[in-house]
Amino acid sequence: MNLTPREKDKLLIAMAAEVARKRRARGVKLNHPEAIALISDAVVEGARDGRSVADLMQAGAEVIRAEDCMEGIAQMILEVQVEATFPDGTKLVTVHNPIR
């Protein structure tokens, strides 16, 4: 399988998000990389589904609650930027204060 660096990054995000989902389902609090992966995956998949940038900026902030994360993680992550592929091209999506 020959993947471009961009495709490898997308695959890594998807895998990390899957690990984070399993841990959250077991009641384990998420760490920084897991929280970022879940938010990023939600944005990338939403773009693939054809959702708008504005919609994903809002939806990305609803993926994780502060109580799902280890202490201090919500305050540490002030924004998440994800480059996602939309039907009309690649765009940078910024989710401000993603963990509330």
From Swiss-Prot:
Metabolic or biological pathway: Nitrogen metabolism; urea degradation; CO(2) and NH(3) from urea (urease route): step 1/1
Enumerate the PANTHER family for this protein. Answer: UREASE
Would you tell me the protein name for this molecule? Urease subunit gamma
Q: Which residues form the signal peptide?
A: none
Major localization class: cytoplasm
Under the heading CDD domains, the entry gives: Urease_gamma
Assigned GO CC terms: cytoplasm
Q: Where in the cell is it found?
A: Cytoplasm
Q: Does the keyword Metal-binding apply?
A: no
- Name of the gene encoding the protein in the UniProt record: ureA
Organism per entry: Ruegeria pomeroyi (strain ATCC 700808 / DSM 15171 / DSS-3)
Q: Which reaction does it catalyse?
A: urea + 2 H2O + H(+) = hydrogencarbonate + 2 NH4(+)
